[in-house]
Amino acid sequence: MGHVLHGTPDEAYFQTRYAVLREPLGMPLGSERLSDDAEAVHAWVQDGGEVIAVGRAHIIPANSDGSGADHKGPGAAPIPAFGPLATHSCERPAFQIRQMGTLPSHQRRGYAALVLGELERLMVSEHGCKTGLLQAREHAIPFYKSQGWSLIDEPYTIGVIGPHRSMMKEF
């Protein structure tokens, strides 16, 4: 069984992120990189030197509704605002989980839960966050529900990535 790590990710982390989240959609190498990766909190599971599950979180600025771009490269799809941030109906500071993924050969073994739990722990204990938000691909919604996250907002589509739902968890 792998163990969860956090800190500054190496290239293997980004290779796993690309292999799981972008390459299957035919997106170019580099689309796995986000403009704020250097400031984000990263967690991953490593097993025998192989990065098998990844995820990241960032604090949503106090003046932001969470809208933005899907990645830092050209042609990035827009990401909609989170309703509770736009209407000021959730507690700040708030954080967003992004880029969660597990290699297909290691899925359904609890690795994503380890990564998500570590990100939640770090954002609450080290950054004082009170609310978490994320945009889940449709197939991932049952996983996030099992971890205590609730659906908010209506379904929407993010470019070639596909249908998503926004979710929230209060801490």
Provide a role label for each language-model segment.
Residues 20, 122, 143:
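Short alpha-helical functional segments enriched in proximate histidine and acidic residues
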